């Protein structure tokens, strides 16, 4: 069960967990219908262990599964100070074809202390917006207005 897994992982060192996790992740079968979810679980465990794995993050950000991409954008936000060119990545993600991915990217931009983040967020209006995207954009712009 999940609780037993959490207990077991908690009894191990970070190095032990990450070594086993990397091995497990490499052995995942791309043909498995749960492949994207399993990679997300690996990404989330890296996050719990406070070990950024930018290559895995970037792979999931490029996934064909929009829910996986959206979840990875949330992790990207938490790791924004630990990944390369986070604003460049978010500039691509605010134009993602899936609205949930765009919403997460817009929300993520609110955590940056720069006017460039506001400029990137505004690029999202080039694609259709629902009430949730509009709300996220309004809140992000309100947060970033002090950096203009």
Can you say where each PLM-predicted feature lies in the sequence?
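Alpha-helix N-cap/helix-start positions at coil->helix boundaries
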Residues: 33-36, 66-67, 84, 97-100, ...
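Hydrophobic core positions within HEAT/HEAT-like alpha-solenoid repeats
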Residues: 6, 22, 40-43, 58, ...
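Extended, hydrophobic alpha-helical segments in both membrane/secreted and soluble proteins
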Residues: 68-79, 86, 90, 99-108, ...
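Alpha-solenoid HEAT/ARM repeat scaffold
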Residues: 2-3, 37-40, 70-71, 88, ...
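Amphipathic alpha-helical scaffolding segments comprising HEAT/armadillo-like alpha-solenoid repeats
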Residues: 14-29, 50-62, 81-94, 114-125, ...
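Boundary/linker segments of alpha-helical solenoid repeat arrays
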Residues: 129-137
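Alpha-helical segment of the N-proximal tetratricopeptide repeat
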Residues: 1-14
């Amino acid at each position: 069960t999940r609780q037993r897994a959490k207990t077991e992982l908690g009894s191990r060192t970070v190095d032990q967990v990450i070594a086993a996790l990397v091995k497990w992740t490499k052995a995942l079968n791309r043909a498995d219908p749960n492949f994207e979810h399993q990679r997300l679980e690996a990404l989330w465990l890296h996050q719990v262990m406070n070990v950024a794995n930018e290559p895995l993050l970037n792979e999931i950000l490029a996934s064909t599964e929009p829910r996986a991409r959206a979840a990875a954008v949330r992790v990207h936000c938490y790791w924004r100070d630990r990944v390369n060119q986070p604003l460049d990545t978010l500039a691509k993600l605010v134009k993602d074809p899936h609205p949930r991915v765009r919403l997460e990217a817009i929300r993520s931009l609110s955590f940056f202390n720069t006017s460039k983040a506001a400029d990137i967020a505004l690029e999202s209006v080039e694609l259709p917006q629902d009430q949730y995207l509009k709300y996220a954009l309004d809140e992000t712009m309100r947060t970033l207005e002090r950096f203009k």
